[in-house]
């Protein structure tokens, strides 16, 4: 069995969660010995689409079984780019077009599975399978932590809270900014960027007025970001809507306490005080971060790590293998 892992605009994916998911798919297939290609001109037995127009999918379906990866929903498109309200009806139609013609759909969580199955055009099976996490990549390495603290010139005992994501209102960066304002003795760092044209006026204004204890370095990769996850005192992810939240998996894999917004996607696999700390507003977020900074969270951290062990690259590879075998049977 050989798979075409297909995505248009591959060069643009690197800085996004979809880009990391695409990379994880490659690693997962390698882990279970499934041959793949990213070249549509190559030979293969089935197609696993991440990003494509419906016309491209229809073309693939004439010859091959096609899996469409359900990275996006109408819900997680809201409050993202500037002019999202104008684009939303067209985006919804796009989702209908691609999900409605898939032979099988893979999506990261039972929550996103429910949302996709609720679309009246979806007739194919929908499989919930995590985007996965490379546990080895987020293992604690002192040299990464040193690179992180040196990069930002942090004092040895300086408390640090990090957030990661594109500069969408949906990601809750404005709340990250306001929580930072209430904790002037803690350094808050948000990793991620977005072009000014795509950033909403609301977010640009909040960023312009961010407090002095908040740093925004833009997109950072390599040792510095790995060191940030391992070396921070807390990962704070106040997103309003996710299909999974790879940042959350990265925080748990790094064995760093995670504070996040209590939203539906986490309801059935991340529990408050057992794996993470969940809040509903900035007042609660501030209190929870203070709790992380001053109380031992060892038990919660270990419980959280068990969650990502179940979403390791190897286990995702086995899940993909099963999905591929299923779609081949469907197409026969």
UniProtKB/Swiss-Prot annotation:
Against SUPFAM superfamilies, the record matches this protein to:
UDP-Glycosyltransferase/glycogen phosphorylase
Q: What is its main location?
A: membrane
The metabolic or biological pathway listed in the UniProt record of this protein is: Glycolipid metabolism; diglucosyl-diacylglycerol biosynthesis
EC assignment: the record states 2.4.1.208, 2.4.1.337
Record's keyword terms, sorted: Carbohydrate metabolism, Cell membrane, Glycerol metabolism, Glycosyltransferase, Lipid biosynthesis, Lipid metabolism, Magnesium, Membrane, Transferase
Gene3D superfamilies noted in UniProt: Glycogen Phosphorylase B
User: By what name is this protein known?
Assistant: Processive diacylglycerol alpha-glucosyltransferase
Gene name of the encoded protein: dgs
């Amino acid at each position: 069995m050989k798979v075409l892992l297909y995505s248009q605009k591959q060069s643009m994916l690197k800085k996004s969660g979809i880009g990391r998911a695409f990379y994880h798919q490659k690693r997962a297939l390698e882990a279970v010995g499934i041959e793949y290609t990213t070249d549509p001109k190559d030979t293969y037995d089935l197609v696993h689409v991440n990003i494509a127009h419906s016309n491209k999918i229809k073309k693939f379906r004439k010859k091959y079984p096609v899996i469409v990866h359900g990275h996006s929903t109408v819900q997680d498109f809201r409050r993202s780019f500037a002019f999202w309200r104008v684009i939303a009806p067209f985006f919804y139609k796009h989702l209908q077009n691609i999900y409605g013609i898939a032979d099988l759909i893979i999506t990261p969580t039972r929550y996103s599975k429910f949302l996709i199955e609720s679309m009246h055009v979806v007739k194919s099976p929908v499989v919930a399978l995590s985007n996965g996490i490379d546990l080895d990549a987020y293992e604690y390495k002192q040299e990464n932590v040193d690179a992180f603290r040196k990069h930002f010139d942090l004092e040895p005992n300086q408390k640090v809270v990090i957030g990661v994501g594109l500069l969408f209102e949906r990601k809750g960066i404005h709340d990250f900014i306001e929580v930072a304002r209430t904790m002037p003795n803690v350094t808050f760092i948000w990793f991620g960027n977005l072009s000014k044209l795509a950033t909403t006026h609301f977010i640009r204004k909040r960023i312009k007025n961010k407090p002095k204890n908040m740093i925004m370095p833009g997109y950072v990769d390599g040792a510095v970001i790995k060191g940030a996850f391992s070396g921070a005192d807390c990962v704070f992810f106040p997103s309003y809507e996710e299909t999974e939240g790879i940042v959350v998996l990265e925080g748990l894999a790094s064995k760093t306490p995670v504070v996040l917004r209590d939203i539906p996607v986490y309801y059935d696999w991340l529990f408050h005080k057992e794996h993470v700390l969940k809040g509903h507003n900035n007042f609660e977020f501030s209190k929870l971060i203070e709790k992380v900074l001053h109380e031992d969270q060892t038990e919660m951290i270990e419980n959280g790590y068990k969650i990502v062990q179940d979403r390791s690259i190897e286990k995702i590879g086995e899940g993909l293998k099963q999905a591929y075998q299923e779609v081949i049977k469907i197409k026969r």
